Amino acid sequence: MLLARALFGDVGEECAVCHPKETAAYQKSRMGNSIAPPAPLAGEKIMRPSQRVEISIAVRDGRMIHSLNENGLTAEYPIAYQIGAGKVGHTYVVRIGEFLFESPASWYRTTGWDLSPGYERMAAVDFDRLVDSGCMFCHADNGKFVGSDGRRFSGETLEPIGCDRCHGSAAAHIADPSARNIVNPAKLSGRARNSVCEQCHLEGVTRLLNPGKKWGDYHPGEPLEQTAVTILLTENKAGEKEEISAVAQAEQLALSQCARQSGGKLWCATCHHPHGESTDRQREMRQICQSCHSSYANAVSKATHGSLTDCVSCHMPRLTPDDIPHTASTDHRIVRRPAPLPDGSAAGAEISLWQDPPAKVRARDLAVAALTIGGLRNLPYLRAEGVKLLEALPPRERDDDPAVLSSLISIRLKDREPQKAQEFARRAIQLQPDSAFASLNLAFALQDGGDEEGAEKQLLETIKLDPSLQQAWTALTFLYEKQKRESDRAALLDRFLGWNPQNIWFRQLKAILARQ
């Protein structure tokens, strides 16, 4: 926390002039310390024999260094930031040029150092998981990412979540302090009020930006679905319980009878205080629960509900999320009796929208979601539904929407229609000429269509647009190998390693190809 102050200054300095109590408490809160320079915390080595990986954490001259040894190749990076206030743990970020990458090593409060979430399932471990604007939206206040793809970081520093994330821009309020020109979430209507929390504490299976929107376009006081929609997926796999995401509190609370029967009175801030929690959290929570359930603390069941009962430990038990190891999440369903998550009983899965976006983009959002989730989860019927919905969109909506075009390219490539995929890819580039993803899609479409010369030129253009996009480098490497252009292949690998000389995968690839 002190390191964050030293580099960033106080969160909400201008707000503190009139609101010293709130800002002082917020500076100690989890959101007020969402990102910071890394604390000098050294640790033991992380060993993964099955992956032939060893990661070391050290501190040199006050700087945290993460070192990787994989199959005899070593790499080490200075850590630029730590994400998380430390209540659960810290994830770490390195900077390579204009790009940010997640370290494969994280620190967990309960278990210490281990692989970052998801890396335990990967065949190879490296510092190559890019952190983009979508990742950083809920962890930093000033994520200055530029370009259509939101991958290139242009700022000097990343700062913790600030006051404006919940209260909106304070410029007018500072010039003329008034309750009329600042957002107070507690005084908003239910949908706008809940959206303030849902911008980060609602995940679903995926979230999609509406056409023409970026993550920074959301402003407190607006319904979140005007900017982005959250897609829910109910998987009815027999004998398996539904998944819980790490930030699925909003979905769980919506299932709670307490919330449903409160008429909208029970919401996030009923129990949580963004400016900082109380020191006697158990007592505070007991009082909140007993404001509606006082009878359970006395006459109804003195045997089990005494005056000092800890309501949360029984009715909001800890759960282990499926997607992030080593962490715990409180069950926000507020169950009467501890109960597992519902078991499915029938095959199939359905998608739905958490809240409806503007009517004109609803069909589009469902189409892109069905196709995306169907592909990621290997649900062919869901993918087929996405194809059907996409093809039913009016041509104007299809042709002017990069996300829709990207989905259509995927469809055409899978259906072995490279010429049609090329048409969609060229249109996507017209809309977003700086998009490396659009350029890469065209390269793949050209290659599938047999135009290797065109594919080569487009892959080189993709690399120029975004040197961090390893798929482009890899595709071009194998194209040169197919064409037996050994000198061009070697020069390409050297060029990549000139940009990122420590990358394990490309060093291994260079060594393998050199032996052939």
PLM feature spans:
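Primarily the internal scaffold of c-type cytochrome electron-transfer domains
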Residues: E13, K21-A85, G89-I96, L115-E120, ...
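Canonical positions in the second alpha-helix
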Residues: L393, R427-A428, E461-T462, R495-F496
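Short coil turns that delineate tetratricopeptide repeat
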Residues: R398-D399, P433, P467, P501
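Helix-start (N-cap) detector for alpha-helical repeat units in TPR-like alpha-solenoids
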Residues: D401-A403, A436-F437, Q470-Q471, I504-W505
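Register position in tetratricopeptide repeats
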Residues: K414, D448-G449, K482, I512-Q516
